[in-house]
């Protein structure tokens, strides 16, 4: 009835190359996450996800970068924590709520919560998800395809299928 997945990642992320921020320092981070699922019945389950990112950023890095014109790079830096709870019914419907928070940002005004809530339906190989909340700016990678996304608030509808 219980299922646990845990992972650790040691990340070296060159913002100069990946996001075109010439002269920006390299992000060296450690990421850990735990995904814990519990099957309540044959048709119901609940899943908990916890994530943490430890960043190499500190106040002196931020001040040094601001003097050379990279202060925008630090809007999303510092340690992050995230949590998500998802409830599934009949393996077709699910609802989830989550929060991502960069509590370790050295600039207090940039310590933001990014709340989200989702409702989804799965039929065979098609998944439809309506999500509302806040999205932090930065690189988003799904299935090996990465893109830079702006910060946003609102709703999104996602339809994914395979054939």
PLM features: residue spans?
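Exposed, low-structure sequence patches enriched in small/polar residues
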Residues: 1-163
């Amino acid at each position: 009835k219980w299922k646990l997945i845990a992972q650790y990642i040691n990340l070296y992320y060159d913002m100069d190359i990946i996001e075109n921020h010439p002269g920006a320092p390299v992000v060296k981070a450690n990421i850990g996450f735990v995904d814990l699922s519990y099957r309540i019945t044959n048709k119901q389950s609940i899943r908990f996800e916890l994530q943490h990112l430890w960043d190499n950023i500190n106040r002196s890095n931020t001040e040094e970068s601001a003097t050379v014109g990279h202060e925008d790079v630090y809007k999303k830096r510092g340690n992050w924590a995230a949590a998500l709870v998802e409830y599934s019914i009949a393996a077709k419907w699910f609802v989830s709520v989550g929060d991502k928070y960069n509590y370790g940002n050295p600039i207090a005004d940039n310590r933001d919560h990014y709340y989200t809530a989702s409702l989804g339906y799965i039929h065979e190989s098609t998944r439809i998800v309506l999500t509302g909340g806040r999205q932090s700016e930065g690189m988003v990678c799904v299935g090996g395809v990465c893109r830079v996304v702006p910060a946003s608030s609102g709703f999104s509808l996602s339809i994914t299928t395979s054939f």
